[in-house]
């Protein structure tokens, strides 16, 4: 499925916590015409946090269903491996989940919506968009 942006976990958490009035909600309204995808690892991280916090599972499902899941494929494996190698050689590795998220955005040739610039700005070719 084609997506216009890939969302990071911190975006989903912000939107969940802030309700309709915060920056993530404002960004969503301003970009209502875009197809916003979440990488499989973002979905897993969000579900894990919701489970630990004891949030209602149906409410979480309803919240997530508006965002199509960006799944792993062969191209992403190669992008991940290349990114890992490049960042390791530069001694600038980022967390493994963040590396998968970056690979998802790069494989789809779309920006990543995140506030985690410290990690993601190290990834060559990754376009970042804040909210």
Segments the model singles out, each with a brief description of its role:
Residues 12-13, 47, 121, 129:
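Nucleotide phosphate-binding site architecture
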Residues 11-12, 42, 76, 100-101, ...:
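Alpha-helix capping/helix-boundary segments
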Residues 7-8, 39, 94-95, 116:
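Histidine- and aromatic-rich ligand-binding microenvironments
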Residues 3, 68-113:
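Active-site neighborhoods of divalent-metal-dependent phosphate/nucleic-acid chemistry enzymes
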Residues 1-38, 48-61:
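Short, well-structured N-terminal submotif of metal-dependent ribonuclease cores
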């Amino acid at each position: 499925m084609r997506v216009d942006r890939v969302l990071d976990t911190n975006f989903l958490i912000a939107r969940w916590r802030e309700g309709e009035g915060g920056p993530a909600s404002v960004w969503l309204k301003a970009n209502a015409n875009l197809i916003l995808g979440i990488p499989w690892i973002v979905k897993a991280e969000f579900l894990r946090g919701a489970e630990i916090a004891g949030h209602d599972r149906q409410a979480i499902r309803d919240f997530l269903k508006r965002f199509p899941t960006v799944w792993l494929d062969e191209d992403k494996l190669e992008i991940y491996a290349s990114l890992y190698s490049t960042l390791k050689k530069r001694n600038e590795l980022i967390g493994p989940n963040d590396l998968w998220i970056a690979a998802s955005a790069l494989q789809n040739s779309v920006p990543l919506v995140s506030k985690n610039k410290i990690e993601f700005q190290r990834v060559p070719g990754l376009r970042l968009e804040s909210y």
